[in-house]
Amino acid sequence: MKSKLIVVSFIWLVILFVFAAAWKLWWVPSQEEAVEQAAQEAHEEAIRQTGSASKYRTQINFAYDSFSGYSIFRSENFKNNLSQKSLKVNLVDDGANYIERLKGLQSGKYQMAAFTIDALIKASDEIGDLPATIVEIIDESRGCDAMTGYKLAIPDLDALNDPEVKFILIENSPAETLSRVVMSHFGLNNVSEKSFIPVANAEEVYRRYRESKPSDKFVFVLWEPYVTKMLENPNVHDLVNSSRFRGYIVDVIVASRDFLVKDEQAVRDFIEAYLSSVYHYRNTMESLVASDAKEAGTPLNDEQIKRLVKGIWWKNTVENYAHMGVESHSLQHIEDMIANITKVLISTGSISSDPANGQPNILYYNKILSDIKNNNFFPGKENLRTESDVLPSLNDEEWSKLTPVGTLKVPKIVFARGTSKVTSQSEITLNELVEKLKTWPQYYLVIKGDASLRGDIEANKALALERAKSVERYLLNHGISSTRVKAVAVEPTGSTDVMFQLGYLPY
């Protein structure tokens, strides 16, 4: 009996101990936590009751970087325009980390951002999602980016077709885009990913140039003001720069699709504020870029500023209407830009597949620009600046003095046996060539017909010339200006190919 009493007493002691422990370890802290939470809520309510309503209707976190083309985002006029629309924009410089930038749009960390079109495509492929859409075009590179090299080692783009040639550049930058455009469009079968030597920043590319020799087979792919510095060396030349082609190095404003659905008005207000600032600075971009560079701690001299501003085409309101298809004009449509850039990225191995699955239209949203145009939004009188595809005509002597740029990569043109008639399959190839030539409007084209060494050489040369002229006629009939094309027969090498060499008239 006594032992049972001891057991029962022990059990009750355990139960009391458990209750005491629970009271001390759970109930008391929970009560204290509840009291603290109530006090915190009361404090927060007091803050709300003793504050004022914000002047801003919406806040937008906008991811971008220090590129001079983005100087308008950092301007006082843009801030004032946003304030008038009750928008607060927090600019976040992520050091051009495009993957994290797109992930930020995906997660809601950012609502809007600046991208180059190629970076948007590559980042979308990398994360396997399309969380952002293009709503406006910021600018297009027009000479700001260039590929330079020593004249002795690399006289033209054809000389790049050498496994010993190395490209010194920054990955995921306009410099890489420029290099991939050249890889895709010219006959550079010996150039591969191994040809690229990525470095951390522009200063490192320039340092590599300073340490190189004229015999080094290096290509330095950079932007202003470094290009100007390198070209001060008479032994260095500009192999190609972004003023020679169109629609590949293009900066755009993108919006998170979720945010766009949630608050399209805020995106519209942002775009109107930005385009108004583009108009405001239309005649003073040099001053803005100079002050922006000085503020960033990287002051530029007058010549560097002039070349930098000349190399960037900031798109105004009417040009955005044209690019986005809101108005019908001769400017390249953004859908074609996206398709062309995607093709370059796939053909050069930068991405394995098209993240838009052959539907470039899902990467842009033109409704906002359409709406503001229909509401007669024009910040001022602006001109739609166009580029003529018609080059000055040349005489025979001038044609003979063209400086070669490089030979375009074109699949073999096939003719009906013994004739100059282009086959239907090769007509498809020539149609693609027409589109390619439209993106290189600043160069003349020499169509070179080669001939077999068998049989009657003179007859073979005559056929080679007729085949070159047949191709020339096809291009002219499909919109290529007659002033920029010349068909010739070259001294026979045994091949029966037709080659396409771009060139320019030296000044």
Residue ranges of predicted features:
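Periplasmic peptidoglycan-binding/tethering modules of Gram-negative envelope proteins
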Residues: L369-Y444, Q501-Y507
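Sec-exported extracytoplasmic/periplasmic mature domains
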Residues: S75-F78, Q106-S107, D125, L152, ...
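Hydrophobic membrane-insertion alpha-helices, especially the h-region
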Residues: V8-W23
